[in-house]
Each structure stands twice: as C-alpha cells, then as structure tokens.
Design a protein with these regions (language model features):
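STAS-typified acidic loop motif
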Residues: 27-39
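Conserved beta-strand-loop-beta-strand hairpin that lines the nucleotide-binding pocket
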Residues: 1-27, 73-153
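Histidine-centered phosphotransfer motif of kinases
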Residues: 60-78
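Conserved short strand/loop->alpha-helix "switch" segment adjacent to the catalytic nucleotide/phosphoryl-transfer site
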Residues: 42-66
C-alpha cells in the first residue's frame, strides 16, 4: 500500500494522502480555463451522488469545489497557457468525503475580509464555513487545497 501512495504522491505532487484506509473515488485534470469550473463541479457532485452521501453533501461539495477550483484557475499559475493542469481528487476517509485540488503555484492561500460590496474574495471563507475541515499543503510542484465534508453516517 505504501508503494501505491508514494506513486500517487510522485505522480500528482499531492500530499493529503497519509492514511492507507483512504479510498480514491475519482480523479480529473482540467486546464487553467474558467470554462472548466462547471465540469469540475459536476464531476464532484456526481461522485457524491453515486456514493450515496448524506442529503445536502452533493450540493455543498459542488459549491466548495467551485470555490477551490476557481481559486486554482485565478491564482494557481503564473502563466495559465503553459501551466500543468489542475488535478482534482475525490476521496473517502471513513465518514469524510475529501476533495483536493493541486495547482502549480506556491502562493499561500489566505482567507480575505471582503468588503460587503466586493464581487470576489469570499471563496475560502465559504469553504471554511461550510466544510468539516479544510486546509492546504505545499508540495514540490506547487500546492494542494482540500476540504472535508461529513458525508456518511
């Protein structure tokens, strides 16, 4: 199992996987283009539905995925045209559904205090408020941002 996890880490550069009990439910790579956010949302929502998550989980997972994928597209590459794709992984860890995005930026994600009239700057606040837990990890090729939802009883 350790060899599989090491191979996954080397291939994706993502480090969230630390528990051998973790089950990968799906993976998807998307280019750094805003039009791909909808595809990422549907991908995560469909997995949540297929795996019979709790009632509101598919919609919440869809919203939070939209936020972290949008952040990866907007902030995740110096030059989106030449950047590697954004890697999205959906995992199950016990009762938790974990969604992770990996991008090529080393920029540390920060929760901002957006003005009431601002049209952006609330994404990570939404992730923090609606998820069971969230965070980010640096990796050799950039960083990963992840969130967890309590998805199964």
């Amino acid at each position: 199992m350790e060899e599989i996890l090491n191979a996954y880490t080397v291939r994706t550069g993502c480090l969230h996987i630390v528990d051998p009990a973790l089950c990968i439910l799906g993976e998807k790579c998307i280019p750094h283009e805003a039009r791909n956010v909808a595809s990422a949302r549907r991908f995560v929502r469909d997995i949540a539905i297929e795996w019979n998550t709790a009632e509101a989980v598919p919609e919440i997972a869809e919203l939070l995925t939209s936020e972290i994928v949008t952040n990866a597209i907007v902030h995740g590459a110096v030059n989106p045209a030449t950047a590697p794709p954004i890697h999205i992984t959906v995992m199950r860890e016990g009762k938790l559904m974990v969604v992770e995005t990996c991008d090529s930026s080393n920029t540390i994600p920060q929760i901002r205090n957006a003005a009431p009239t601002a049209t952006s700057g609330r994404g990570l606040t939404v992730v923090k408020e609606l998820s069971h837990n969230w965070g980010w990890l640096p990796h050799p090729n950039g960083k990963s941002i992840w969130f967890e939802l309590l998805a199964w009883p």
